[in-house]
Amino acid sequence: MSDTPRGRTADYTILTTGYTTSTGPGVAATVSYVTDGDLHIVIDPGMVASRDRILGPLAARGVGADDVTDVVLSHHHPDNTINAGLFGRARMHDHKAVYQADQWTDRDAEGHELTPSVRLIRTPGHSAQDVTVLVGTPDAVVAFVGDLWWRPDGPVEDPVAPDLARLRASRERVLAVADVIVPGHGPAFAADEAVPL
């Protein structure tokens, strides 16, 4: 089965562009918003200077916290998840389940579709539980990769990755399908031959 989303009807925006220069002490997550049909999806609502960096851009689009239907967590590091509680009514998705209120449903993220245009795939490497969100828009396939890449320049060798070979294999898998990559802590960039592996 191809990783490419079957649909091309979704739209996305980056709510706030994160940063990192090393392994600390400062870091901010790149937080993104995807919409497709009735779904309003926030990806990696992590560390930011203020919650307004997430809620403000949503409000500018007419979307309140309670309107968000789904949150996808690329992995369970606090810098990518710390503001998930802003969206208490949403379904939370990770590598192994969907959570809502006080219930969860086990399911593997691999190939799970939120819609035909929004697909999850497992991409371990930065952590053993990494998930990438592949989004089919009318113009491109956009990959929200969490920390497979922290920013456009890598880092090539992730200093916290438990398995660099798996990281590289997951990066290659994403590059085989994506036109645009949204990293965990920086601006979006083209998925081309300049991307560090």
Regions flagged by a language model, labelled:
Residues A29-V31, A109-E110, D130-T132, R171:
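Short, acidic/polar N-cap/turn motifs at the starts of alpha helices
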Residues A49, A128-L197:
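Metallo-beta-lactamase
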Residues I43-P45, D67-H77, H93-H95, R122-G125, ...:
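Active-site neighborhood of phospho(di)ester-bond hydrolases with catalytic His/Asp-centered motifs
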Residues S22-V27, P45-P116:
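Active-site HxH/HxHxD metal-binding segment of metal-dependent hydrolases
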Residues D3-A60, T132-W150:
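Conserved beta-strand hairpin/beta-sheet module of binuclear metal-dependent hydrolase folds
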Residues T9-I14, T115-I121:
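Short, hydrophobic/aromatic-rich segments at coil-to-beta transitions
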Residues S22-G24, I121-H126:
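Short Gly/Pro-enriched turn/cap motifs at secondary-structure boundaries
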